[in-house]
């Protein structure tokens, strides 16, 4: 069992924009958390053959899905389809979000 506000796991990225932790306890899914500092943005990326679920737990900001800009806040969940470019931008309070994706990405 995990606490949604502390998924444990290993820090896989850390810089002046964010801290990203991945929990790889399951064989087929990765649970990843991102603490995105205030007024910062992720680099953005897309995946071929993979969908993702983003759950926003604290703060507010925006998620970009290809050319679409959506406002997000604590309690929002975004379903990201295969091949869609996505990046997250935080507001003045920063953002904490958890995403779940196919663990085979790292195989």
Regions found by a protein language model. Give the residues of each.
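Ligand-binding loop in jelly-roll beta-barrel domains
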Residues: 82-107
């Amino acid at each position: 069992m995990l606490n949604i506000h502390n998924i444990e796991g290993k820090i896989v990225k850390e810089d002046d924009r964010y801290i990203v932790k991945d929990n790889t306890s399951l064989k087929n899914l990765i649970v990843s958390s991102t603490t995105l500092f205030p007024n910062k943005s992720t680099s953005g990326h897309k995946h071929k053959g993979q969908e993702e679920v983003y759950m926003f737990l604290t703060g507010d900001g925006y998620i970009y899905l290809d050319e679409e800009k959506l406002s997000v806040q604590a309690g929002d969940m975004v379903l990201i389809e295969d091949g869609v470019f996505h990046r997250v931008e935080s507001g003045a309070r920063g953002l904490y979000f958890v995403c779940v994706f196919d663990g085979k990405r790292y195989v």
